[in-house]
């Protein structure tokens, strides 16, 4: 009987562990989608976003996926100009604030004032700062504290979320 009890206890612990992990995965789902309807001035329905964006753009900008490093042509672009949100065309970053972070994503040490919103991102068992367009809520990337002065910030941005306009 002791062996059966021990197996049941082990099975119960294993089940509790699986349920805990499942709860964390559900909790890690994008929060921005829930907040969009009331938070951002520019709004579209899910079907309108899908019509406006390619499937990959939709995955990154509306579902917080990440493009592979070194795949965006904007990563190596250093022409003078402005980077806009692909979702709503709001100005987000100036080329003056772009730098080569070596990470494989377009990186900026400063955004255009008021153009980028942030929130805590607790996915993948860590806390990061997610950044999004303040006008439409489209996911841009994350902000880290390892950038150059004067801000010390690195806005690590998915190039697929941006459109570049030459000055």
Predicted features, each with a name:
Residues 1-11, 22:
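N-terminal secretory signal peptides
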Residues 89, 137, 157-160:
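Cys/His-coordinated zinc-binding microdomains
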Residues 146-151:
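Short linker/helix segments within small regulatory modules
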